[in-house]
Amino acid sequence: GVDHFHDVHTMSHKDVAMLARSVELDIAVDLGGFTQNSRTEIFAMSAAPIQISYIGYLGTMGANYYDYLVADQTIIPEKNQKYYSEKIVYLPSYQVNDSKELPPEITFTRKELGLPEKGVIFCCFKLSTLF
């Protein structure tokens, strides 16, 4: 859980950085990096004493205002650390999911899901707000 939630999506980059400082945020984690609609400007203004890049962009941010980048040995082998401006924090798997802990087998019939008994079903599990 969290103690406080601030909806900042309509705030300017500067106002978000100032808010983060005013609430004495300890660590800011950038989940977007150099991707569409990211807000790296907030990190450039030092929103928190410790700033981390994780999951959304797997390359170096190449900026002195990012302290750490979270990865695994597959994403960034130790021999390649020299190409990153950030210190690398290694996890066993940089993704929060892994293939070692499989979910329990749950099966549904097409009828239970309101689907026709025959035919092809297309699915997209993409975040609809990505663009």
Model-derived regions, located:
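Conserved nucleotide-cofactor-binding alpha/beta core module
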Residues: 1-63, 74-81
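Conserved catalytic-core segment of nucleotide-activated headgroup transferases in glycan assembly
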Residues: 93-131
